[in-house]
Design a protein with these regions (language model features):
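Short, electropositive alpha-helical surface patch
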Residues: 87-100, 123-136, 165-175, 206-209, ...
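Active-site acidic/histidine proton-transfer and metal-coordination neighborhood
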Residues: 81-187
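Acidic (Asp/Glu)-rich catalytic clusters
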Residues: 2-5, 26-33, 52-72, 97-107, ...
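Conserved, mostly hydrophobic/aromatic
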Residues: 28, 74, 92, 103, ...
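N-terminal pre-domain/capping segments
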Residues: 1-75, 79, 83-98, 295-325
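Active-site beta-loop-alpha junctions enriched in small/polar residues
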Residues: 14-18, 39-43, 76-78, 116-118, ...
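Gly/Pro-rich active-site loop or hairpin
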Residues: 124, 162-170, 196-267, 275
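Non-cysteine beta-strand/loop elements that form the S-adenosyl-L-methionine
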Residues: 34-39, 69-73, 186-192, 221-233
């Protein structure tokens, strides 16, 4: 039985598949994760793999063996359903639909995608375009018991990004519903670093309560199914998305702990996207999440931890699984 957060909540991390799919599951188990987020294919390319990767059956078996779930698949960074360009829109619909169709093979429950950018067309036009795209995507994917849910992730608010507030997310949900998108097929993800960058004070438990109450009244907290649990290097409201080790950034342990213990979020799956996955900080941040949830004091991080940046988590399955570049 994997280690759980309060009320049996599950904590995962975004881990790379480039070194092998089964090894990624073993790594998740080793670091104490009880859920997993992955890229199912190359996150920076439009071309998708033809057919399942060779390790997929063994990957599923290992997930069952270690009781790691739910699996979230992060869609490619290129996807943008909110922009006015027809070519980009069409490619985005095709790629997101492909990842949704592929998700059951990975035991994927969620396909997480950024809300996107209206690229100057305006918030209203971008919202309508996104809703049209979601309708087209879901029309291409069978609605069966194993189908994954599309999960829209909030934006830090840089440039023309949509989804920077509960109001904008609610408008997206309403626009999608008006086009016949069932609520059971469309969920939402709160990225704590994004919300902080957009100006939401997640360091303050009272402000968190206000935000969640607003989300519940406008959208419904049952549709908030994922939280990307990240601290932030950036100033609140800066629109700068720079993730930090848990409890070492500007959000801090008080706010993150409130999110981890909040009674209205017992159904949510939490996923870390913190720095230094390749340097062993994945295990450290999983442990810190449990300490924060329990209200325990955090150990000091070594000085070099603050210099760590990216990780191989930004890759899909390696060449032995036919990764396409």
């Amino acid at each position: 039985m994997p280690r759980m957060l309060p009320d049996g909540r599950r904590l995962g991390a975004h881990l790379p598949l480039g070194g092998g799919m089964v090894k990624a599951v073993d790594r998740a188990h080793e670091i104490g994760a009880s859920a997993l987020q992955i890229f199912a294919d190359n996150p920076t390319a439009w071309r998708r793999r033809q057919g399942p990767p060779t390790e997929q059956a063994a990957f599923r078996a290992r997930l069952h063996e270690h009781d790691i779930a739910p699996v979230a698949i992060h869609a490619p960074y290129l996807v943008n359903l909110a922009g006015p360009e027809d070519d980009l829109f069409g490619r985005s619909v095709a790629v997101l639909a492909n990842d949704l169709r592929a998700a059951p093979g990975f035991l994927g429950r969620f396909v997480n995608v950024h809300v996107g950018s209206h690229r100057g067309s305006g918030v209203a036009a971008g919202t309508a375009r996104l809703a049209d795209g979601l309708r087209l995507v879901l029309a291409e994917v069978d609605d069966d018991p194993d189908a994954a849910m599309v999960v829209l992730e909030d934006s830090p608010g840089s440039g023309f990004g949509l989804g920077t507030s509960v109001t904008e997310l609610a408008d997206i949900a309403e626009s999608a519903a008006a086009r016949g998108v069932p609520s059971r097929r469309l969920g939402f993800c709160l990225d704590t670093a994004h919300a902080w960058a957009a100006g939401i004070d997640l360091s303050d438990p009272d402000a968190i309560d206000t935000c969640l109450a607003d989300f519940d009244s406008r959208i419904g907290l049952d549709r908030l199914v994922m939280i990307h649990l990240n601290d932030s290097k950036s100033e609140r409201g800066s629109h700068s998305d720079r993730h930090e080790h848990l409890g070492a950034g500007r959000i801090g342990a008080a706010g993150l702990g409130h999110l981890l213990r909040h009674s209205a979020l017992a159904h949510v799956a939490y996923y870390l996207e913190t720095p230094g996955m390749d340097e062993g900080y994945d295990a450290i941040n999983v442990a810190r999440a449990h300490d924060i949830a329990a209200g325990r004091p955090l150990d000091d991080l070594p000085a070099e931890a603050m210099e760590v940046r990216g990780s191989r988590a930004r890759t899909g399955p390696g060449p032995d699984q036919d990764r396409l570049n």
